[in-house]
UniProtKB/Swiss-Prot annotation:
Glycans are attached at residues 58, 105, 757, 1189, 1257, 1301, 1317. Disulfide bonds join 202-213, 207-222, 224-234, 404-440, 610-639, 647-658, 652-667, 669-679, 1018-1046, 1053-1064, 1058-1073, 1075-1085. Residues 198-235, 643-680, 1049-1086 form the EGF-like domain. Residues 28-1568 are extracellular. It comes from Homo sapiens (Human). Its main location: membrane. It holds the Pfam family Laminin_G_2. GO terms for molecular function: cell adhesion molecule binding; metal ion binding; neuroligin family protein binding; signaling receptor activity. One of its GO terms (biological process) is social behavior. This is Neurexin-3. Residues 1294-1318, 1611-1643 are annotated as: Disordered. Expressed in the blood vessel walls (at protein level). Highly expressed in brain, lung, and pancreas; a lower level of expression is detectable in heart, placenta, liver, and kidney, whereas no expression can be observed in skeletal muscle. Isoform 4a is heart-specific. SUPFAM superfamilies: Concanavalin A-like lectins/glucanases.
Amino acid sequence: MSSTLHSVFFTLKVSILLGSLLGLCLGLEFMGLPNQWARYLRWDASTRSDLSFQFKTNVSTGLLLYLDDGGVCDFLCLSLVDGRVQLRFSMDCAETAVLSNKQVNDSSWHFLMVSRDRLRTVLMLDGEGQSGELQPQRPYMDVVSDLFLGGVPTDIRPSALTLDGVQAMPGFKGLILDLKYGNSEPRLLGSRGVQMDAEGPCGERPCENGGICFLLDGHPTCDCSTTGYGGKLCSEDVSQDPGLSHLMMSEQAREENVATFRGSEYLCYDLSQNPIQSSSDEITLSFKTWQRNGLILHTGKSADYVNLALKDGAVSLVINLGSGAFEAIVEPVNGKFNDNAWHDVKVTRNLRQVTISVDGILTTTGYTQEDYTMLGSDDFFYVGGSPSTADLPGSPVSNNFMGCLKEVVYKNNDIRLELSRLARIADTKMKIYGEVVFKCENVATLDPINFETPEAYISLPKWNTKRMGSISFDFRTTEPNGLILFTHGKPQERKDARSQKNTKVDFFAVELLDGNLYLLLDMGSGTIKVKATQKKANDGEWYHVDIQRDGRSGTISVNSRRTPFTASGESEILDLEGDMYLGGLPENRAGLILPTELWTAMLNYGYVGCIRDLFIDGRSKNIRQLAEMQNAAGVKSSCSRMSAKQCDSYPCKNNAVCKDGWNRFICDCTGTGYWGRTCEREASILSYDGSMYMKIIMPMVMHTEAEDVSFRFMSQRAYGLLVATTSRDSADTLRLELDGGRVKLMVNLDCIRINCNSSKGPETLYAGQKLNDNEWHTVRVVRRGKSLKLTVDDDVAEGTMVGDHTRLEFHNIETGIMTEKRYISVVPSSFIGHLQSLMFNGLLYIDLCKNGDIDYCELKARFGLRNIIADPVTFKTKSSYLSLATLQAYTSMHLFFQFKTTSPDGFILFNSGDGNDFIAVELVKGYIHYVFDLGNGPNVIKGNSDRPLNDNQWHNVVITRDNSNTHSLKVDTKVVTQVINGAKNLDLKGDLYMAGLAQGMYSNLPKLVASRDGFQGCLASVDLNGRLPDLINDALHRSGQIERGCEGPSTTCQEDSCANQGVCMQQWEGFTCDCSMTSYSGNQCNDPGATYIFGKSGGLILYTWPANDRPSTRSDRLAVGFSTTVKDGILVRIDSAPGLGDFLQLHIEQGKIGVVFNIGTVDISIKEERTPVNDGKYHVVRFTRNGGNATLQVDNWPVNEHYPTGRQLTIFNTQAQIAIGGKDKGRLFQGQLSGLYYDGLKVLNMAAENNPNIKINGSVRLVGEVPSILGTTQTTSMPPEMSTTVMETTTTMATTTTRKNRSTASIQPTSDDLVSSAECSSDDEDFVECEPSTTGGELVIPLLVEDPLATPPIATRAPSITLPPTFRPLLTIIETTKDSLSMTSEAGLPCLSDQGSDGCDDDGLVISGYGSGETFDSNLPPTDDEDFYTTFSLVTDKSLSTSIFEGGYKAHAPKWESKDFRPNKVSETSRTTTTSLSPELIRFTASSSSGMVPKLPAGKMNNRDLKPQPDIVLLPLPTAYELDSTKLKSPLITSPMFRNVPTANPTEPGIRRVPGASEVIRESSSTTGMVVGIVAAAALCILILLYAMYKYRNRDEGSYQVDETRNYISNSAQSNGTLMKEKQQSSKSGHKKQKNKDREYYV
């Protein structure tokens, strides 16, 4: 079949082979034998491709070539018919044939090419073409088979061949050479009856002087480029060739007509006055460049043009005379023409014959189409580029030339245009655009850039394209996915099918997905997605991409393979705004609207690989320079491929899978429980108890068509929600849940709601078996449009969604519990278990939430691998039970519960049924029995635990029955399985009884059921075949004592009574746990403390003490839990009042935790040097200070101790504020802080309760709910808030001596000392004169204050607390004056007592001298390393009351009675109140075993027969009870079984003591009641004061003055209910005058 060729695109490629093989031109010789064949690798002729070879024969029939689709419809066959070549082919069962006009059986060489272009196939024979065209349903040919030359093997089944009789066709006889697919040589797979060493025309070696022979149009041609000779056989000297005379021109003349182009410049000669009309033309020029692609010369338009360009380093010529394009490409033997060396090009045309030669040697000759011979052009002659190169007709490239051009000359029969010279002399018809330099300068190469990480990207300026535009670039990578280019336009509100506003934008993008290149375009009417490659392009080779658009239509070319596209709608304008992103997207995408169809963006796939030669609208972009200017992270200005595989060094840790990427290794951490570049960082774990969840609230509604989801989970339940996406506006969801021990994936795209035509409801997949085994399991979900893949461990399930709708909408990602339930008919069961490494589309959400990297995380689950006890219920007696609705377990069953008991026997679960069916679970002699009857008689399965389970520990029980009637009982880790034959269904009726039965039911139980009593103990986490009942609220009937929670029967301190190093403290009828230094809270210190997450932008929590209530301390305790990944940051800092400079700071430096503090001398620091703590794990740090001594401990690591040398001050003066987060100091902390405790203040709890003294700013977010501060009764373990603290208030004496001369041998107390600083602007330890606002004596009162909300100190076992020997007869010595006794009346303070204002006259100040267990020796000198101060232990059974009565004090003298010294009794305490500002002081009587009181050093007790214990403190009565005035009780002091909390010793040079545990917290509370005998007490008080005045009136050691504005204790109410006591203000007056009224007071 012969037809006229219109617009046939013929490409003739000259490829020079290397070495001796080329010189010999070896080929295949076919003998024409039966069953002869040569088999080559499949030729992809599906859409666009070329195949060529040369042959010689003398026969008229024979099969040349054959391929097909495996016996269906499509085939292509070349054969000889009557001496001519016939092309016969079929597509989609539509067949045609083409027959050449030329005879070929003439024993001459012939060149044959088959060119495929979708519906058209062209047969080219010796430059003449015949085409055949089909109009099938599909525009491509399906090729399955390999390619056969010379014949088809007879062993192939005829049914597998599409063309009937092809095997019977006679074989080809002759020679075939140089078979190529495009430019590449295919691989020979095998042959039969073929001689492989046939010589071609080059076998005679016709080329002289080392020239290389190759075939051109069937004739041998010589390549003389490397010989220095010319001519047809390389036999002529080049200097004698007149055709090359221009090479002999002087260098000066050559340089005169040369110009440099840099990509934006070009020359334009106007032909409108003198149009070209010629039948023969000649173009000559020389070029020099580093550039691979660029326009050299162009003239003409429409279908009449000449285009000369550099394409991928080869010279390309395209000529169209009106009947179709002729293209010739000339390539060098070695390398490319873009080698920055001069190359000469000569193009000649004579009528239809076209010849192009490069460097006078490489020559290609061809013919234009049809009979058109005239070239006409009245347009422009472009040199070096054009305004829009991509839009020029026939242009194979889209960018301008970069390099040097010289002596560009066009001539025909009529004119000669020396274009370079005309530009140089500025001819009027020649326009010069850009800065063209008329000499050859070096043009900087467009260096490639390498994106080394997926996060790397650079920003390009806005692409100003409206109706047309072009982009070209080269890329190279080995990774399959990555976003290469993206830009979009202005958001526009449009209504979608849901009749809702939807933000749409015009956008343009190029992405690499699964190794294929895609173009995405939306011009306002919908997105098109064009696949531009037929094979994967991530093989590490360079690929050239050229995109050209004109209105709605355009093409994308990859390595010259073009794919056309047409945008949707009618608009021809692409409206873009903002930057264009190359290589990826920025981390902050707030201003970006990402299209749903752009999967790489939604999946967070950044491009990793190289990009070079980026041209936009023909103009180059120096992307290397842009990357340097933007300081782009992860972008390198070079491109080289590492030869060694990166995974050979096994870089991935923790059994992660290593994959080789582009010059990097990729560690797949899925399933390892770790994350990071090498999977070195442990991923955070969330624990769920059925009431907990984590909800990620997306900042905006998300729409995706592709998702990657992975996580690990561990659970003992067979049911429960794992992860789900939910929408507020639709039923769209991607949900993963446990369903009967399997993972169920359900995807619902709500197709019905948006009026889709085809929908079958949610798509469901299942994978995995028996996953409720309390082991880690890994889940992965991959969705790409309609394709679904679910993988659980190694079990894979795949599916395809039905319908055209692929978009998933969601507002939230939820775990544990589904809170968005509006569009859900059946709510999934809550999850009980652990979740880790949740990654959704590249984001690790659990760790992002924990570290504060995201602000839209709602967290109720708890971090850490915790022992989960969900919704526990206590059955306090064996007669207690409850009933629930019938257990639904007809075909299968999954039961789970936890129990804890000390009883060996008891009913746990029972449900009777129809007939004999029943199920029972019981505890028999400490072992679980599972008893059941399905109708075949009762069976029992007994648990095989290693020991009885009534050990007061929690145990897990799982009972399952599957469809095959296999029953299994798992107790903790032990499993027993039994297969039951016969009936398979369990038909239950009536109530399900839990923990027991009604009394009358025990006598009617089936046999094999042993229990005759109920269960006494705790049940938790009860799961009844997927249903999580609330045992209390869902009960149909309850009987006996059933309580929520599980306190357990233990009322004494055990080793495990308090978790997380909490301190167990024995109480009267129970125990409490001191959680102060643990960062935890709750009854047993196993609940998280108040937790705040500090974001990356920094935050600050600032607590400020009231101005009149600023403490000063000699010792401090600080504890906090944290997790972070920062290397530097301040966690907590406490500062003194302005001007003092004292501070204490907890910080992380170089990843290690440390504390630095200054209390008046130099900075003292202590640091944990061994291990960094910025590993993202949860750590608890504990710090104690006693004077200059300090301890620091992290978790259970060894304690760091620091004892500074030399003289050290000890008091931390006038503490003013606590700053948490480091933002105020510029050292930001990012991460989680939990349970902060400092000297009695739980600052984070106070912040969560909106304490008015706390301010919060910056990125700070509270996690979950604030732990309850309400206590329980004393008979059970109590929370740490219901505790008592000991406060000892001392003031320092000002003396006339200097500090250097003072003695350092003073006695130090071991308790924390809170020192009233009286707001002095100087250090309390520096004897600088400080004048208070008033004068007078100052009281020094050791106080024991009952604090209802502070944490108790440690209780220890010790002998009786003894009294100081010097104060047995009468312990109270008070000196005062009449003036000082009138303080109360002068203050005029209001009354806020419990009784109201009427009871104020009878309120009093209750004073107790019972301190922290220290003794006082009167023989010791009254000296201290800073001040003279004394503390006395004093117990009174009367109270010293002060009230407004006749302008003075009423005082009750204390007295001692022998009944006060009884063991296990507490002395009577009277409660009175002076005003609302008075503290309640409760004193206790120490028990004594002897009447003698030995002398003991301060802070020590006589414990010779005891093991070392922490410091002795006294436990007060709880404030929740009224004191019985008729009974005397002594404090209970026990020895708890716990690890000591490290505590710094007092500052004492040269002595190191075992750290104790003590704290000082100052609180106040109101007192009630009236003191009897006011008058007698006042009289006694006056006598004592007079005696004291007489004895001490002549002392010259300085005096204390009473500041009447501050000597009352204020009750400043706090938001959390505690009362803060105002400090007493002191004055240091080392040089003050002595006045007679100055007195000293010791109480």
